[in-house]
Amino acid sequence: MNKYRVRLFSVFVVCMILVFCVLGLFLQQLFETSDQRKAEEHIEKEAKYLASLLDAGNLNNQANEKIIKDAGGALDVSASVIDTDGKVLYGSNGRSADSQKVQALVSGHEGILSTTDNKLYYGLSLRSEGEKTGYVLLSASEKSDGLKGELWGMLTASLCTAFIVIVYFYSSMTSRYKRSIESATNVATELSKGNYDARTYGGYIRRSDKLGHAMNSLAIDLMEMTRTQEMQRDRLLTVIENIGSGLIMIDGRGFINLVNRSYAKQFHINPNHMLRRLYHDAFEHEEVIQLVEDIFMTETKKCKLLRLPIKIERRYFEVDGVPIMGPDDEWKGIVLVFHDMTETKKLEQMRKDFVANVSHELKTPITSIKGFTETLLDGAMEDKEALSEFLSIILKESERLQSLVQDLLDLSKIEQQNFTLSIETFEPAKMLGEIETLLKHKADEKGISLHLNVPKDPQYVSGDPYRLKQVFLNLVNNALTYTPEGGSVAINVKPREKDIQIEVADSGIGIQKEEIPRIFERFYRVDKDRSRNSGGTGLGLAIVKHLIEAHEGKIDVTSELGRGTVFTVTLKRAAEKSA
């Protein structure tokens, strides 16, 4: 800004000097012309006056010479009297005179002869009775040098005064413009840095206010645009980072420039290890690399179901690859979306296994019933002993079939979203006492001691008594089933600060550690032969698990092969019994 002011000021100064020089030359010429005209008029009058004083008929008399000498001092001129032959008779400065001017005068050139050496010459003929008797020649110095000095002095003084005035107004004006322009420049600089809160404040010059208003309007518009873009970007990033599917973006050159959180979680990687790397170096799985190359080659959408190894497991991913095209069909890159289908595949497999198990479980009792019925129809009814045995088997298989159907109905009802519990506050000791009474006969038949251990003080839980009775009846019945003769089964109630633990412990055959995670699966049996002989359906523990989870409780299992198993159910504790 300062350099610009210096350049502008220099231009002003040069222009001003040129104007004053031209003006000075013009005035000088004007004054010189006017002064010369006045000098010519003045010397003409003096010459005519002097000629009127001279005695033209007798030029050599002493009176004429005295007049000429007196006139030289009085009129501040040099005067000479010349005869007709061009001889200088006398003069105010003696008999000296410019010979060229004398010759011109004698030749008939009267009036202003010339101006040389800053002198003005004027010649006039003298006549007596109509005859030319001589000449008078006057010369006077021009006084224009003093006038020129005064003129240029005035111009110089005017120039200095004008210079001071111009400098003052120029500095004042440019300072105001400078503040406005510098303010606008600073705002523009801040805007270029991304500081859209910068503003310029006017008031210096009205016209410059328009620039300030324009800059402020631009800043406001840029701020709004930036906020809108940031909001849209944040929304997009939020969506990208929080979608359940993994997402990767590859640019047109094959470099990965976006990896979302879901992908990093799915593949157990650090996103920074993949960013700004070529896809064939970043991806560990050849199937994904081949899919990307196919999209690059064909520029079409691809969708594949891939089974990829991740650490110690294999997971299924439905990978959608979509090419990104610009407005002019310009290739921008690829977006890969990884949908984790592992759970879906597991559910499909569970559904297949469930259908197969249900079919098998239903087929076994139906086959038995059909077989024994056909045997009876073929003539075995005549044998009373065989008839009684076959009918007992048919009854047993029918009861087993009924139990299976009932368990399937219970499991289906529990897994429905609209399944509800009849929650109330009750004392579990009474419910467990009823279970002990129901199963006491079975325990006595096998010679198993069944004990219920409850604290002396009443304890209350919040839950559905009917469903919880179903849970513990199943657990105690299983404990009796898998405990050999002479063993023991104990039901222990252990109150804690915020909940109550109810244990069902037996001294039975136990469960292998690798089988414990699977005992709550549908139709899974630890001892298949014993379970079938006892009439079990394989759905009891699956129902137990779902009912406990519906109560927001927890069930744990600890077991040692050959020494027994402990099922621990944790339920919410209630403060007091409801009225």
Curated annotation (Swiss-Prot):
Major subcellular site: membrane
Listed GO MF terms: ATP binding; histidine phosphotransfer kinase activity; phosphorelay sensor kinase activity
Residue spans crossing the bilayer: 8-28, 151-171
Entry-annotated residues carrying Phosphohistidine: H360
Record topology, Extracellular segments: 29-150
One GO location term (cellular component): plasma membrane
Localization per Swiss-Prot or TrEMBL: Cell membrane; Membrane raft
Cited Gene3D superfamilies: 1.10.287.130, Histidine kinase-like ATPase, C-terminal domain (3.30.565.10), PAS domain (3.30.450.20)
Superkingdom of source: Bacteria
Protein's membrane topology: Multi-pass membrane protein
Keywords, ordered alphabetically: ATP-binding, Cell membrane, Kinase, Membrane, Nucleotide-binding, Phosphate transport, Phosphoprotein, Transferase, Transmembrane, Transmembrane helix, Transport, Two-component regulatory system
Class of the enzyme per the UniProt entry, highest EC level: transferase
Cytoplasmic side: 1-7, 172-579
Record field: catalytic activity: ATP + protein L-histidine = ADP + protein N-phospho-L-histidine
Occurrences of domain PAS (ranges): 234-300
Record-linked InterPro entries: 2-comp_sensor_kinase (IPR050351), HATPase_C_sf (IPR036890), His_kinase_dom (IPR005467), HisK_dim/P_dom (IPR003661), HisK_dim/P_sf (IPR036097), PAS (IPR000014), PAS-like_dom_sf (IPR035965), PAS_fold (IPR013767)
Listed GO biological process terms: phosphate ion transport; phosphorelay signal transduction system; regulation of DNA-templated transcription
Domain Histidine kinase: start-end pairs: 357-575
Quaternary state and interactors: Oligomerizes, probably forms homodimers. Interacts with FloA, colocalizes with FloA-only membrane rafts. Oligomerization is assisted by FloA. Another study shows only minor colocalization with FloA or FloT.
Function: Member of the two-component regulatory system PhoP/PhoR involved in the alkaline phosphatase genes regulation. PhoR may function as a membrane-associated protein kinase that phosphorylates PhoP in response to environmental signals.
PANTHER family in alphabetical order: PHOSPHATE REGULON SENSOR PROTEIN PHOR
Identification of the protein by name: Alkaline phosphatase synthesis sensor protein PhoR
